[in-house]
Amino acid sequence: MTPHRVLLIEDDPLEAALAKRTLRQIDKTIDVIRLRDGAHFLEFYKKNRPVKGISLAIMDLHMPRIDGFGVLKVLQDNSERTPFPIIMFSSSEDKEEIENAYTMGAAAFVNKPVMPKAYRAALEHIVNFWLTTNRR
């Protein structure tokens, strides 16, 4: 199997560890690269341009320094289209935030559940759709 490199943009270290462990349990070929926040993502993106070998980015919405909207805005303002989908993974259920994420270029917005089984199911949905069904 071809390994998948997934960017995980998450400021909370415990949340990041949980997501990384869960993604690896779902698919052992996933290599997770954790970036602390939106600013760290933009630094990574600029430094590694053109970015190759990344299958997917899973990004929290609310983070310090630059949040998920800030990342999408910078990419949009620079007419950048990443070669990989950016999935917003957030506990926000605010319809306006969800609509804004799509308008600004997010490929999907997936609710981040609190309960462990639902959390795993949400990540399985992301992996199954974006890394298996809808490969670019």
Where are these regions (language model features)?
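Active-site residues of response regulator receiver
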Residues: 59-60, 90
